[in-house]
A protein has these predicted regions:
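Glycine-rich flexible loops
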Residues: 1-204
């Protein structure tokens, strides 16, 4: 908490238990962030990693309360794999019940558009996978907003095409693979981010 994104390092991350107590690290915990993350991991023990933030385009699109339209291959990666959740819309989740009301609606979805709030992605495989799909979901929201702003009715992908694209570009392996280039760039350009950190192997 109180660490700018540009200053986040492996050395200043914290480890917290499911009661919100800091086990490792010297920073305080963000209560609202913890409540949501803890609820997801309690509800879905198989979830390896979850990403959540209030990004510009994601938060803007979440205000519409609508799922993504299948306007591109990027959006198709989330075909039948993302959900709009209206529970606790716009409210700061500081109570356990608020986190649970959101977590219980995630199901098997890779991405979540939390209405009036922001984006959330989950992975059953790795942090790499969850992180890439978070970036991809933000990009898909940006594309949707740009199309809407044009005032031109978009040509949507057919269900068959969207399903086909998701099967080929929406897997855990693709998420993991695409994040490797991002990780390598970070490791090379951010000298305080250790490239020797243990990496998750590719999904089988």
């Amino acid at each position: 908490m109180c660490v700018h994104f540009s200053q986040v390092r492996m050395s200043n991350l914290i480890l917290a238990d499911h009661k919100g107590r800091v086990v490792e690290g010297r920073h305080a915990i963000n209560r609202a962030g913890f409540v949501l993350h803890a609820a997801v991991h309690d509800e879905y023990p198989e979830v390896m990693a979850m990403c959540h933030a209030h990004t510009t385009y994601g938060t803007a699109w979440c205000a519409t309360g609508r799922p993504l339209d299948m306007i591109s291959q990027d959006a198709a990666a989330f075909y039948n794999s993302h959900a709009v959740i209206g529970a606790s819309a716009g409210a700061v989740a500081v109570e356990k019940e608020s986190g649970l009301s959101v977590a219980q609606q995630i199901g098997r979805n890779r991405g979540v558009l939390h209405q009036n709030h922001g984006l959330l992605t989950c992975s059953h495989h790795s942090i790499d996978d969850a992180a890439f799909w978070f970036i991809a979901l933000e990009r898909a929201c940006k594309q949707q907003l740009l199309v809407e702003a044009s005032g031109i009715k978009p040509q949507l992908l057919s269900e068959k095409t969207a399903r086909y694209s998701r099967e080929h570009v929406g897997s855990d392996y693709i998420g993991w693979l695409h994040f490797q280039t991002l990780y390598n760039h970070i490791a090379e350009t951010q000298p305080t981010c250790s490239p020797e950190a243990r990496r998750a192997p590719p999904p089988r």
